Amino acid sequence: LREGKRALLLVEHFSNMDLPALCYLLDHCGKDFGPELSKRIVAIAGMKLNEANPMVKAWAEGFTRIVIYPSRSLASITDPAELEKESAKSRAINMASMRALDRCKKEGNAVLVFPSGTRYRPGVPETREGLREIDSYLRLFDVMLLVSTNGNCLRINPDAPEDMLADLVYEDVVIMSASPVLNCKEFRAQAMAEAPEDMEDKKPFVVAK
């Protein structure tokens, strides 16, 4: 960032405490660069955080973020009229988010993305898989950090998985580990080269790497 490079953080997503925990660790354990990086993080957030509940929205607004309309949200709509309406809404929101994303990069911020686009749910392995849109982020940024998380103190309530206010608080140790700084272009090129030659759409393969 100090050299003017566009930086991307790809972070595992287990709970709504992931971003606060990362910022806390950067502020308190990040040596000379941590507090500066913490202040420069802009998170990509699904609109669910804005619409699920006023309390959830208020809590989310404590962090700088860009709101998007996730593509997987359209997949569950079966009514044609509703799909057309939501598709138009999706395009408007995501066009605005792309302009905001471009502005953030130019201002020297680090953009944080949760590759799965949702919190991981035990027993639902697809919630841990990266979305194919992550390939587009790799093409938009110069360098990236991959951040893994072990431990979770705010867990999804199995009896109310869609209600964020019903999340269960646990005492736990949360350890976040970061990769070395990776060159996005080189990473993507290597992944593309490793993909099977007969694979038509290589984006999911790149994201899975």
Identify the meaning behind each predicted range:
Residues 14-18, 90-93, 203-207:
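Phosphate/oxyanion-binding active-site loops and adjacent basic polyanion-contact surfaces
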Residues 6-7, 142:
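Conserved acidic residues
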Residues 89-103, 128:
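A Trp-anchored, charged/polar loop motif used as the substrate-binding/catalytic surface
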Residues 1-2:
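N-terminal signal-anchor transmembrane helix
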Residues 28-37, 96, 102-110, 139-140:
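Secondary-structure boundary elements
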Residues 7-86:
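Catalytic core of membrane glycerolipid acyltransferases/transacylases, capturing the structured
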Residues 195-209:
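Short, cationic low-complexity segments
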Residues 58, 107-197:
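A cross-family acyltransferase "interaction/gating" segment
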